[in-house]
Amino acid sequence: MADITVAELAKEIGTPVDRLVTQLADSGVNKSATDAISQDEKEALLGHLKKQHGDESEAKPNKLTLNRKTKSTLTMGHGSKAKSVNVEVRKKRTYVKRSEVEDEKLAEEAAKAEAEAAILAEADAKAKAEAAAKEAENEKGVAAAKAEVEAERKAEAKIEAAAKAKIAAVEKAKNVEQAPEKVAETEEAKKLRLAQEKETLAKVEAEAAAAAEAAKKLAEENEGRWKEQEAERKAKEKEVVHLTSSVYAQEAEDKSDSADESGRRRKKKKAPDRNARGRNSGRGKGKTLSSPQSLKHGFTKPVETKLQDIRIGETISVAELANKMSKKGAEVVKAMFKLGAMATINQVIDQETAALVAEDMGFEVVLVKENALEEAVLADRNDTGEEITRAPVVTIMGHVDHGKTSLLDHIREAKVADGEAGGITQHIGAYHVETGHGMITFLDTPGHAAFTAMRSRGAKATDIVVIVVAADDGVMPQTIEAIQHAQASEAPIIIAVNKMDKESADPDRVKSELSQHGVLSEEWGGEVQFCHVSAKTGLGIDELLDSILLQSEVLELTAVVDKMANGVVVESKLDKGRGPVATVLVQEGTLKQGDIVLCGLEYGRVRAMRDENGKTIQSAGPSIPVEIIGLSGVPISGDEATVVKDEKKAREVALFRQGKFRDVKLARQQKAKLENMFASMAEGDISEVNVVIKSDVQGSLEAISDSLLKLSTDEVKVKIIGSGVGAITETDATLAAASNAIVVGFNVRADASARKVIESENIDLRYYSVIYALIEEVKQAMSGMLAPEFKQEIIGLAQVRDVFKSPKIGAIAGCMVTEGVIKRSAPIRVLRENVVIYEGELESLRRFKDDVQEVRNGTECGIGVKNYNDVRVGDQIEVFETIEIKRSL
């Protein structure tokens, strides 16, 4: 199409001339109405209009070209003849959109179609214009010419619209055709890949099935032979005969046997005597000369490393483990670090950790039970026999002023058999009574303290608990404590309501108060028997004994008589004339004079036996308390007493238990004290604060308990192990020792027996008279168990004025201290333009050639930074300290 003027173009597209001139100027084409416009200028105008209407697809670049230039220097040759060559590498890379190459073909087709449409439109327009001009001049004039121009404009608009529709159809067809091709290609590739995977899987399954079939046939053929070989190997391993039961003695015995075997082999291979006489032993002609032989080394290098089995006990130190493996201690410590366990060379580790380390280093481990001897000794007993009914063991508990002692005295006076002279021996804590329905064994008040110790050790020496409550006084805090002990031992309870002869007796009040603590009488629908008795008049004593025997029948208590005895220590003491004396309650079997008894940490032969009346007896059956003499030491109350066969083995077991008890005692020294609670928390030993509280009145006790429980958080918890009203007793101290607790006394004090236990067990005991002080100290202890926070505080700043070189240290910074103090032991930072460039520590700090520990503000000094020499003039050296900030609740 020939170039036309701006006015003609405005007339063709039907827009005012002024508006078209403005749009051309906005697109960068400055034209007037009479100027001609080219095709490129029309395209520029069209792009500008599209951009204004939001179509920026053609405005965005489709290609991006990057030019890169790299310069480097290459040194050729060595020494003085070396030459440097400058190398410059230029790279040019063009990035094209993914769709551009594909769209070029479509763009070309669209351009061709548009050109053809334009040519046709131009020819048609020319023909129509010429015809219209002629007709206008000849026939109709100006009106006909205007109509023809309008028709020409409409025709061009239709042709342009048809061209655009064709371009859009081509683009749509391209998008529709591309998708099926890609989908078809993807489906074909997927089918091919699945077929290959299926074929490979079938081959692998066929090979695996063939291998399994071959292995099965081989196992069936050799099954019998393998079982015989395994049985022979196990039999050989078990053929280890030792004369002693000690592990160390067994190892020494094995070494001695191996030395003897090697000595016998050397004797067999010994050379003949050089002085022996014979036909060929003389000198001269009869002597035959042997041909010279090449010397052979006596040591043959092993083909592969032979690792020995090592025996590991329940506990072993790192040094002992290294010695058994013939390794250096540092190697074992390094191996433990790799496994995530940190230990020193003298630290004792458990059996599992030692086995893991040994197996990791390539050794085979044989785990040894150190208590194997103890189990063997206890198993070597005749435990078979006929079971018969035994007497119940009854513990009488209660407040000291509620008539417990009077009740025991009345039972003793009424039921001791005729002809038995003398009264009950006061220092023996157990005795038995014969009734018309059977025998009953009682544990008196000293047995109460032992009962707490038994409960902490898990021994169940008591069958029935009788709790004495005064009818005129009601339930006291120590009565509640007795109920707690009885419920913890899971023993049935019988309530004896004493002092019923008094006018102020109110048994219903006792029942009501006990029901608040989970003790319901049978009359109120519970399971606890209530007996109304009077120790003064003897009222209800027979009913109480009948209730005890009835409860024992329900329990169906049985024991074997004809076997070696075992029992529990009720009480023990050291007598000046007789030595260690222990009161033992026989639970099973028959204890005889001359038996060898293993009693906790002690052992010995029973040299004499006495009953509760002080009479010498020869034997004692089940549920009979006896006093034995002949032990090696004073046993602990609650320990188990067992009769064994061999005194030598009993001694070994006792010594082993003593060593184990020593380790446990050392471990128990880490008590939950207020001063070292944070240290214990860091070791992971304590996760909660155990407290035993004793107060003067019940109101204060409730207030303290509620306040302490409210202090508990997610990290630290307060656990009240026991609480009560009254003085701190021996029972409280024993309970605190067993549960690792702190004993808190509020306006109360500990009695003499409790102070002895507290001193021996190293229990933390605190007295308070103000509740706020108590809560504050416990709060501080809990805050100490929280993990601390750390904060860095700047203590000094020095400005570098000059830098010197030292042959020993390196760069020395001559500084002026501008703020605070510079300490040699504190860490430092080097700042350059207020940016930290190095963090480390000082290597030297000098003032006038003298080494100093600190330099204060306004003083010059020389500073050497360790492992850093890039100190420059103008740098700042900052000295700081790390401060630990304790967290609080």
UniProtKB/Swiss-Prot annotation:
Here the segments flagged for biased composition (Basic and acidic residues) are 52-61, 214-241, 252-263
InterPro entries assigned to the protein according to its UniProt record, in alphabetical order: DNA-bd_dom_put_sf, EF-G-like_DII, EFTu-like_2, IF2_assoc_dom_bac, IF2_II, IF2_N, P-loop_NTPase, Small_GTP-bd
Record keywords, A-Z = Cytoplasm, GTP-binding, Initiation factor, Nucleotide-binding, Protein biosynthesis
Stretches the record annotates as G2: 423-427
tr-type G domain location is 389-558
Region G3, as annotated, extends over: 444-447
- Name the UniProt record assigns to this protein: Translation initiation factor IF-2
